Amino acid sequence: VFLSTNAQIKILFDATKAEMAGNADWVIDADEFNLRTNSNSTVTIGGRESNPQRFPTPDQSNITSTTPENFWTGGISGWAIDLVKHGYFVETLPYDGRITYNDSTNPQDLSNYKVFIICEPNSPFSSTEKSALINFVSNGGGLFMVANHSGADRNADNWDAPQIYNDFFNNNSIKTNPFGINFNYENITSKTANVINDSNNVILNGPYGKVSQVDYYNGTTMVLDKSANPNTKGLVYESNADNTSSNNVRFATSIYGIGKVCAVGDSSIPDDGTGDPGDTLYDGYFFNAVGNHRILLLNAVIWLATSSGLATDDIMKPELSVNIYPNPSSDYVYVQSKTSEKYHLTLMDSSGKVLQSIPNTDKISITSYPKGIYYLVIKNDKGFKNFKVEKK
């Protein structure tokens, strides 16, 4: 799959949480190797770790369908280069960048991106960062969280990735466990073909192929909490696990608000085997699981970049020039446009659960729903637009 169109959808890779610490190099490109990851959770100049800049070099406009993964120097450059080949635009949030949402003073505010990828954070998120991440997802962003095995504390700050993510989920000011996911504290090395049977799932059966195997080389599983978020779903499980249960999950998804989440428990999966010359890296992206990891990660990002209520090709369409009224409303919400066109309207609750999906209309009733916040997706064959609706 290769799209030569000018990319409009932007994917941001995090490098603010010491993702380059120790023998990890979970960055897409670095021109310098001068960072030091410290035991007080800070990252400073004065060491030998990768220092990824905002825009990878050489420029991504030079990437073609045959560009190799070592075109850039980073342990997950293969993933990023494949995303560029698909038509996306990729950036890094550098070590001194800020994780914010709707902060106009930050040129890399999350509102400017469709997907945010965090590959094995080694330092915890602040309270404001947690809120930014949750609000980013709630308002339509896609969040990809890659963890690693318990005890992988690469910067000696007494935090490993499972602890960092669980702290994010369960100690924030917005909602306890918003995505319905928690990481276990395990260290697992094994292969599994226990993939759920769902031919309609675009991650498991997507543009890059069918996922049939996922290998862990020191990873951890997840437990799902559907009482916290009924939209959480396990796609890949441990070999002997019940793949309809909430335990022993290797790859999970969730929907929160009008945004989406993917989570996987092993950072060896996106590792392409080359990067920081001072690290020993292993090819889990292309080689392990007979190429299934590449299929899984690419299909997953495409799903994340597709808004809830939309098909995978809808996201490439422009935003519709429409509005809604009244908002807040106690009964009906109407589409306001300069034409007499009808639209497909999808109404969701705050967890992302679809409440109504109505074709060929310009209004939708919210009369029977309790007061609160809802999300409305308006689309037709020309494009789409998302709205937050308040029921009064």
Give residue spans per PLM region.
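Low-complexity, Pro/Thr/Ser/Gly/Ala-rich linker/spacer regions in secreted
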Residues: 2-8, 305-320
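Aromatic-Pro/Gly-enriched surface loop or interdomain linker
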Residues: 4-112, 298-305
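Active-site-proximal beta-strand/loop segments in catalytic clefts of secreted hydrolases
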Residues: 14-17, 93-97, 118-122, 146-151, ...
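A conserved amphipathic helix/loop scaffold
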Residues: 19, 27, 71-77, 257, ...
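Short, flexible/disordered intra-domain loops and linkers
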Residues: 23-28, 59-70, 152-162, 274-288
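Helical hinge/lid and interdomain linker segments adjacent to catalytic or ligand-binding clefts
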Residues: 64-166, 171
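An acidic, glycine-rich "communication" segment
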Residues: 149-256
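C-terminal outer-membrane/trafficking sorting elements
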Residues: 315-392
